Amino acid sequence: MQKIVLATGNPGKVRELANLLADFGLDVVAQTELGVESAEETGLTFIENAILKARHAAQTTGLPAIADDSGLAVDALGGAPGIYSARYAGTDASDQENLEKLLVALQNVPDEKRGAQFHCVLVYMRHAEDPTPLVFHGQWPGVIAHQPAGAAGFGYDPIFYVPALGKTAAELTREEKHAVSHRGQALKLMLDALRDA
């Protein structure tokens, strides 16, 4: 089995990808298991940050790497919080603090202007000097609710309402969410590309 480093310390992401990539003969290992520190996210886009993370992990370990960068873009806020989604309320802010800051920012915004999209960019880098990393983008449209609902998921899921399903992302089962989410879409594109390779 070919070993590949996942540029994250998030055990949930590692587990999910490890199961899906095992069929392709890939053994997914979290960068934290290999003693790799997180890369500094200095890019201005999800794509730039995902490439920075993948390159850092590949450079440090000498292994192929997969990285993701994702976040929420709210129309009424010009795309914010965007690449700053995880630290919208400050560097060490909790999911709840980020969510509350977003609700305050949108408190006077009418329903028809509360459109938003979750974005996920997945990058597969064969080696640190890979001149053509594979880049996959998933986008999930929704609306920012006025109040949180649901206990599943994380981050902004409790206020990300999906009109087509009549629920927030935090009210969906893991299977329902994976079938329609930004990360699920990007992952499907990556798996299709690996299948065709």
Curated annotation (Swiss-Prot):
Catalytic activity field: XTP + H2O = XMP + diphosphate + H(+); dITP + H2O = dIMP + diphosphate + H(+); ITP + H2O = IMP + diphosphate + H(+)
Active site: D69 (proton acceptor)
GO cellular component, one term: cytoplasm
Residues that bind substrate: T8, G9, N10, P11, G12, K13, S70, F154, G155, Y156, D157, K177, H182, R183
EC number(s) per entry: 3.6.1.66
Assigned keywords, A-Z: Hydrolase, Magnesium, Metal-binding, Nucleotide metabolism, Nucleotide-binding
UniProt cofactor note: Binds 1 Mg(2+) ion per subunit.
Annotated coiled-coil segments of the chain: none
Cofactor needs: Mg(2+)
Residues holding Mg(2+): E40, D69
CDD domains the record matches: HAM1
Pfam families found in the cross-reference section: Ham1p_like (PF01725)
GO terms classed as biological process: nucleoside triphosphate catabolic process; nucleotide metabolic process; purine nucleoside triphosphate catabolic process
Record carries keyword Oxidoreductase: no
GO MF entry, a single one: ribonucleoside triphosphate phosphatase activity
Family assignment from sequence similarity: Belongs to the HAM1 NTPase family.
Subunit structure: Homodimer.
Function: Pyrophosphatase that catalyzes the hydrolysis of nucleoside triphosphates to their monophosphate derivatives, with a high preference for the non-canonical purine nucleotides XTP (xanthosine triphosphate), dITP (deoxyinosine triphosphate) and ITP. Seems to function as a house-cleaning enzyme that removes non-canonical purine nucleotides from the nucleotide pool, thus preventing their incorporation into DNA/RNA and avoiding chromosomal lesions.
Protein name: dITP/XTP pyrophosphatase
Lineage, broadest ranks: Bacteria, Pseudomonadati, Pseudomonadota, Gammaproteobacteria, Enterobacterales
